[in-house]
Amino acid sequence: RDARDRGAKHIELRQTFLGNCETGKGEDWRPVIGNFQSLVDGFPDLSFNLAIAMPCLSGGVDPKGEMFQQALTAAKVVGREAPHLRLVDPAPQDKVWERPGDIPEEALSVADLAREAAAQGITLSVENSGQSIGAIALLVAKCREQLSEEEGKLLGVCPDPTNQIRRQPDTDALGDLEAMPLDMFKIVHFKQVRDGQALLDVDDGDMDCARMVQILDSKGYTGPAIFEIPSHQDVFENLSKSFAYVEGLS
């Protein structure tokens, strides 16, 4: 409610921050579907997506397994007519993929997850964490080769340039963002670090937010943007500051 009152239009519901809408941890995590329904019914003027961590780059997710199927069900509930499930694999990666041949076979199992999600009308996006934005874009392009055109359209990337700046500092995060085709953008993340340390709001720092906004504007991106604001007693004030800062860059 506070986020909406400060101008938020879209909320990402993130695993481990869901209160009575989730139970269990790790492989035992499950959504509480009825509570999700009650939550979104209370905010008809907001849109939502669901975000969960899964070992999707190591082939460790069964598309027919209970956890993934439950996540898809929850995504449909919270996303209403435009369901969207965002995945992130938090496991560290040995090296950044620079060409399609670098991608291990097990990572291509994302195509199976995308096919299952698409069969239920759900957009599936993969966030860059242990890999760069460019590497995840390579993965999506490779997986799309295994999918129908309609299935492929529902698979994309959740780019987070700040993740890349922190974890792959020798790469060009915003260059990767600019190179990615518009149809791969499903949702974007804004957050900021300064001298490698997370800030409490989005402001000037190591990530060039002005260039990020310029790239998104030049591409014609109109999808949701998520502001990742660390927990703090002034979290909603920090959210308002972040909105104002980024809006001032356009």
Q: Where would I find each of the regions flagged by the language model?
A:
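Structural motif corresponding to the early beta-alpha repeats
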Residues: 2-105, 163, 194-196, 231-232
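Acidic (Asp/Glu)-rich catalytic clusters
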Residues: 1-7, 26-49, 67-82, 114-119, ...
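Acidic/histidine-rich catalytic cores of soluble enzymes
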Residues: 10, 111-206, 211
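C-terminal helical cap(s) of enzyme catalytic domains, especially alpha/beta-barrels
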Residues: 235-250
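Short glycine-/acidic-enriched loop or helix-start segments at secondary-structure transitions
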Residues: 22-23, 135-136, 236
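A short, acidic, flexible beta-alpha connecting loop/helix-capping segment that sits on the rim
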Residues: 226-237
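Charged helix-capping and loop-helix junction motifs
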Residues: 26-34, 64-70, 99-110, 169-178, ...
